[in-house]
């Protein structure tokens, strides 16, 4: 055993590294697919739901931050969760309160208070984006009618 006892090697980490290395040849293809999906999400959510895109145009295509002014993030989160759609509010740096990152980007409170963070992975499809857009449009109708 060359001086090592069994259990010394971090087998889960080794297997994770193996998987990452095996996936390297597909990285550029996956990145291009993510960019296309991210752009589709931007266009779809803006045109169908009136979403304001907070993410810069040159952001990495794995996270999209949007706002639906007039609707609080937490209210939208619960509405989406009830439909098995899971996103986050604000930014990863500000769980539970207004995001200083979004404020530093120059966003007004109306946008930071309604911000949603959408994360993408290689398994997401345009259909997933369409379902999200449908749910956000429904949320706007229901919440407007309920005066929330």
Question: Where are the predicted features?
Answer:
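Pyridoxal 5′-phosphate
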Residues: 1-148
């Amino acid at each position: 055993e060359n001086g090592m006892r069994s259990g010394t090697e971090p087998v889960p980490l080794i297997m994770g590294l193996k998987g990452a290395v095996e996936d390297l040849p597909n990285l550029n293809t996956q990145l291009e697919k993510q960019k296309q999906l991210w752009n589709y999400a931007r266009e779809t959510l803006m045109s169908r739901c009136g979403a304001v895109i907070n993410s810069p145009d040159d952001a990495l295509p794995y996270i999209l931050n949007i706002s639906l002014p007039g609707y609080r993030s937490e209210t939208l989160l619960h509405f989406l969760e009830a439909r098995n759609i899971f996103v986050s509010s604000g930014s990863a740096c500000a769980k539970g309160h207004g995001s200083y990152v979004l404020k530093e980007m120059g966003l007004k409170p109306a946008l930071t208070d309604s911000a949603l963070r959408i994360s993408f992975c290689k398994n997401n499809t345009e259909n997933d984006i369409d379902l999200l857009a449908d749910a956000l449009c429904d949320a706007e109708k229901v919440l407007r009618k309920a005066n929330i």
